[in-house]
Amino acid sequence: SELARPLTANKQLVAVLCRNDRFTLTADAATQLHGHAALMLDGSRPVGEQVDTLTAYRPDWIAGPPGTAEALAEAAAVRDRHELAGGELVSLSGSDAPMDPDLAVLLGTSGTTGSSKYVRLSAAAVMANAGSIAEYMGLTPVERPVTSLPLHYSFGLSVLNSHWLVGAAVVVSAESVIQKGFWEAVRRNGCTSLAGVPYTYQLLERVGYRELDLPALATMQQAGGALDRRLTATYHEHMQAKGGRLLVMYGQTEATARMAYVPPTRLSEKLGSAGRAIPRGELRVEEAEPDIAGRMVGEVVYEGPNVMLGYATGRDDLARGDELGGVLRTGDLGYLDEDGFLFLTGRSKRIAKVFGLRVNLDEIELLLREHGPAAAVAGDERVRGACAFGSEEELAQLRTALAQRLHVHPSAFELVRVEEIPVTSSGKVDYRAVERLLRSS
């Protein structure tokens, strides 16, 4: 392609400033097809704010929108600039540090927090995950998904890769699901599927999605965190009524994107489940102990060909090979039911101590979300909840109900009314921003 022409035969690191546009899709595809490695960055953030990442990884090239070279002038030594349709390819001083021949993609783990910790993915892992997704979804060349998620986010990128693998077209929209132009593009192009995280589904409720006339849209995908059971059931029933389906899935960037899914035919009976392992993957629970309900809860471990090579925090780490051997300790807690379906109960790191008791913050958050948008974080000897719903009286009643359910004093909880729950660019709860919001309230 025109974009790949300036790149040398030696393996190069290309930082892609990802936006939902054709240039980003071309940059990603050209980089990987020619054996180079793509560092996927959030293109909605000014490049000047990403200097720490660029300094840590010393990319050889940056593929970004028009004006990228100018924006970089003060932050990096620009050697050359190639104008292309929809963007530009900027040559930097780069690095002579070797890279693992298998390395294909670097994806961030931190949303918008600015961490330089990235997941190293091989081309084989990307292809394996795309193949598994295409298989369990039954994808064909007539599919036509729309870019409803950022492409620097593993879920958004996996939608692209899995559909490209079967020869399907992808409809590119830079607009949000709350904008009229997005739905006009969906209708005009006959889009067949829409992917979203829990926050996306909250926005869909806001725009009255279920009243929209979208006859071609037969598949909805949900991942990126637990969607509350009420909304899951609502969208499952809505899609069933129109002859479509809702696919609930579970994954991590460390496993390229997806590790489990709930077959739509089992969704009603397995409401709340993260699903069973994707084709060629295996889920198990290790170091399990009985919880209050007598369920054997332990750390979720995933094994499969889509597991990352390892982490990186800078350019020198890119020479490292496969450090995990296809086995990922997810850090998630959960249990498997008698049919092998996974139910998540929280994160091993999302545990708070309240009056000497261990309290699962994710469990609290799910209980709060039954009433509306919410997030839970740890405070001093209590759980603090940010709630974008309810009056002062209603929150006081909810606090009492939580205390009774968990057999603790109501003072173990502080629920604060907020305008909205802060989210990252990928639509997940931004817990650092939640903590700042609660400190200022």
What are these regions, as identified by a protein language model?
Residues 127-144, 152-193, 278:
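Conserved AMP-binding/adenylation subdomain of ANL enzymes
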Residues 104-131:
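Conserved AMP-binding A3 loop
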Residues 83-108, 114-115, 138-144:
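Conserved pre-ATP/AMP-binding loop-to-beta segment of ANL
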Residues 276-280, 290-321, 359:
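Conserved ATP/PPi-binding loop(s) of AMP-dependent carboxylate-activating enzymes
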Residues 2, 18-19, 39-54, 66-68, ...:
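ATP-dependent adenylate-forming carboxylate-activation enzymes
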Residues 2-44, 148-149, 358:
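Conserved AMP-binding/adenylate-forming
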Residues 16, 304, 309-310, 331-411, ...:
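AMP-binding/adenylate-forming catalytic core of the ANL superfamily
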Residues 191-196, 205-269, 282:
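Gly/Ser/Thr-rich phosphate-binding loop
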